[in-house]
Regions:
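Glycine/serine-rich anion-binding loops at beta->alpha junctions
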Residues: 73-88, 167-183
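A short glycine/serine-rich beta->alpha loop
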Residues: 66-67, 86-90, 128-136, 166-174, ...
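Helix-rich "cap/lid" substructures immediately adjacent to catalytic or cofactor-binding pockets
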Residues: 134-168, 298
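Beta-strand segments within the central parallel beta-sheet cores of soluble alpha/beta enzyme folds
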Residues: 113-115, 159-166, 196-208
Length: 311
């Protein structure tokens, strides 16, 4: 679920898009309480209002008191299945209420200027969408790659200035990079494509950017979970068009909570090791004359364990 969808509807009901000062007042006076509660729950409403006010105030300082949009993209958790997406298998995943939010002002200069709390990002000129080896593993590469993915599919892109804040921990296993990719894709969709690009398409473009421009091998699970939102079952047997089924399920209704523990570690510098996983899994599949592991049975795998270890 993305706040932008709800916020645009609310603003349209008012008849116009609002400047940042007016959005701040709307947050303070409770006019967005229903939308924020839908995203984060009633117990988090007060803290989220403080968070949004702080982000909006900083955005006003950096971007000016201009007409703006707010976007949100969530992190994700794997409920069932890990490293099964790139093996054309199945997985159950869910978005979480930790997200990256951004205040965005459209521009006509074809440049993306992205300010983020805690780190700096160089402006990205969308006139140049070539792969840049020097940008490997950078935020700039993801922005450029998503813009390239949009144009390859015949969609429009354009410039914008943004200030963002994220509580999806980087390197914490919640897919902060996929959340960012979905955020950028959603911004391009809403600002320049009348919000007509599907969640699934945005996810695919995000994966393309991560694989080709960020240069990290990954399946489609992370982007799809962040983009589709809520609980979802995914079957990747059809590589180009995976089957995604939303599941109407709230763990709290059954007495369950998902607890995330910050163990003060990160896999942010392990991109090469992560990229090796699908290659190693496909190497095992090749021993059976198959492309991916979903094409062999569990019994075949167990019967040949010694051979696999030897190889």
């Amino acid at each position: 679920m993305r706040l932008e969808t709800h916020l645009r509807k609310w603003l349209n009901n008012k008849g116009d898009i609002m400047v940042i000062t007016d959005i701040i007042n709307a947050v303070k006076t409770g006019q967005l309480d229903d939308k924020l509660t839908a995203l984060y729950g009633a117990e988090a409403l007060a803290s989220q209002k403080v968070r949004y006010e702080e982000v909006l105030l900083k955005a006003k300082d950096l971007l000016g008191d201009k007409e703006a949009h707010i976007f949100s993209a969530p992190g994700r958790t794997e409920v069932g299945g890990n490293h099964t997406d790139h093996q054309l298998g199945r997985v159950v995943a869910a978005s979480i209420d930790l997200d990256v939010i951004a205040v965005v002002v459209p521009t006509d200069d074809f440049i993306v200027t992205y300010h983020a709390k805690g780190f700096s990002v160089s402006p990205v000129d969308l006139h140049n969408l070539e792969i840049n080896e020097a940008e490997k593993n950078t935020t700039e590469s993801l922005i450029r790659g998503i813009a390239a993915g949009f144009t390859k599919k015949g969609y429009k892109v354009g410039g914008f200035k943004a200030y963002s804040e994220s509580n999806v921990l980087s390197g914490g296993g919640m897919s902060s990079s996929a959340a960012f990719e979905v955020l950028i894709g959603t911004i391009f969709s809403h600002l320049y494509n009348d919000a007509m690009i599907s969640s699934e398409e945005i996810a695919k473009i995000g994966q393309f950017s991560e694989n080709v421009y960020f240069m990290k091998a990954s399946g489609l699970l992370d982007q799809m979970a962040c983009s589709v939102g809520s609980f979802a079952a995914m079957d990747f047997a059809n590589k180009e068009n995976p089957q995604v089924t939303s599941i109407p399920f709230n763990p709290a209704d059954y007495g369950y909570d998902l607890i995330l523990t910050d163990v003060k570690a990160s896999h942010a510098d392990l991109s090469d090791e992560y990229s090796a996983v699908p290659h190693e899994m496909k190497a095992v599949a090749k021993l059976f004359g198959k492309e991916v592991l979903s094409q062999i049975s569990l019994s075949e795998l167990l019967e040949n364990t010694a051979k696999i270890r030897k190889e």
